[in-house]
Amino acid sequence: MDKFRVQGPTKLQGEVTISGAKNAALPILFAALLAEEPVEIQNVPKLKDVDTSMKLLSQLGAKVERNGSVHIDARDVNVFCAPYELVKTMRASIWALGPLVARFGQGQVSLPGGCSIGARPVDLHISGLEQLGATIKLEEGYVKASVEGRLKGAHIVMDKVSVGATVTIMCAATLAEGTTIIENAAREPEIVDTANFLVTLGAKISGQGTDRITIEGVERLGGGVYRVLPDRIETGTFLVAAAISRGKIICRNAQPDTLDAVLAKLRDAGADIETGDDWISLDMHGKRPKAVNVRTAPHPAFPTDMQAQFTLLNLVAEGTGFITETVFENRFMHVPELSRMGAHAEIESNTVICHGVEKLSGAQVMATDLRASASLVLAGCIAEGTTIVDRIYHIDRGYERIEDKLRALGANIERVKGE
């Protein structure tokens, strides 16, 4: 397994170009299964999960090519089962189910894998599809969905806000007969992006970005060209990198209006922030950040995917900060690893109390999930001495060339090939 070796401390400064959003690219790739004409998807990040999704679409019979953009032609899809071999590494594969059953009347997906953070059950996906008229069976580790004729529009009230299930229901409803209303829908920018992609193909969707999405079913979806929105979590991660190293950064190809909650907390921490249409700049003027209190919740509140990075910020900030995680359980696995580097923190149920220290020291640490591992790499950039971050395959699932981008900002980081 590959590792990162990071020498610190360094001040991170310069410019970084933000990649397309993984959390929009994945649902959009699977939504392309609904199209009866070729689609071109631009600004798709080069990531492990994206490669796995493309491989899965190919196995289903779609023609998939990548030459800058990703081209998908799903006209000849003739396999309706997403096998365990591919699904086990990535829970996003569940998003194949809605498009398959909506367009072909059948689909099966192995129960998914992915990051090990808390219970992320597929029951909300299943109940949504059942309400649209699909018959669902769980057999031999597979979710099997089928319908006679077309799915039927329905008024669906989500038990809890779920990005994944909102995507599944919205995609399936585009080809259903009649109108579907999703109440308590997720409002994330990536949901809006997926909806806008479907509209480009001819879907009739309104209300995306609010908690009530309306989909009027159409008979077929055509082709089109679509550009994936910038990755707000990657943007936030690099902004935190500059903040904790007392540096200065400009993020290009960013979308500031998707990051309001994060930018507000960075300003509270003492950062000087400016924004334009597609850029964000942050300048700490050489100052140490101030501790902030953060509570994660569904969008537009503070994103859970930025929690680990802000935990790190608080651990090297002036003062004491409280971080409360309300979205996923079991999401403080980075805290004991950061403690090995000299951080002072206590975990009390779903809150971590961070007591800022002047400096961290390099250590050997282990990545546990995608965002936690990014925070360990950033910790290595500002710690004194050498930090080895193990199991970095987690990072490769969600960050495109993170070491190259950090190096361009002045980090001393190298990838060490594993046995």
UniProtKB/Swiss-Prot annotation:
Catalysed transformations (reactions): phosphoenolpyruvate + UDP-N-acetyl-alpha-D-glucosamine = UDP-N-acetyl-3-O-(1-carboxyvinyl)-alpha-D-glucosamine + phosphate
SUPFAM superfamilies given in the database record: EPT/RTPC-like (SSF55205)
UniProt name for this protein: UDP-N-acetylglucosamine 1-carboxyvinyltransferase
EC number(s) per entry: 2.5.1.7
Residues with 2-(S-cysteinyl)pyruvic acid O-phosphothioketal modification: 115
Keywords (A to Z) from UniProt: Cell cycle, Cell division, Cell shape, Cell wall biogenesis/degradation, Cytoplasm, Peptidoglycan synthesis, Pyruvate, Transferase
Keyword set includes Cell division: yes
Main EC class the enzyme belongs to: transferase
Amino acids binding phosphoenolpyruvate: 22-23
Pathway recorded for this protein: Cell wall biogenesis; peptidoglycan biosynthesis
Gene3D superfamilies noted in UniProt: Enolpyruvate transferase domain
Main location: cytoplasm
Residues at the catalytic site: 115 (proton donor)
Family according to the record: Belongs to the EPSP synthase family. MurA subfamily.
List of residues binding UDP-N-acetyl-alpha-D-glucosamine: 91, 120-124, 160-163, 305, 327
NCBIfam families: murA (TIGR01072), PRK09369.1 (NF006873)
Molecular function per GO: UDP-N-acetylglucosamine 1-carboxyvinyltransferase activity
GO cellular-component term (any): cytoplasm
Its job: Cell wall formation. Adds enolpyruvyl to UDP-N-acetylglucosamine.
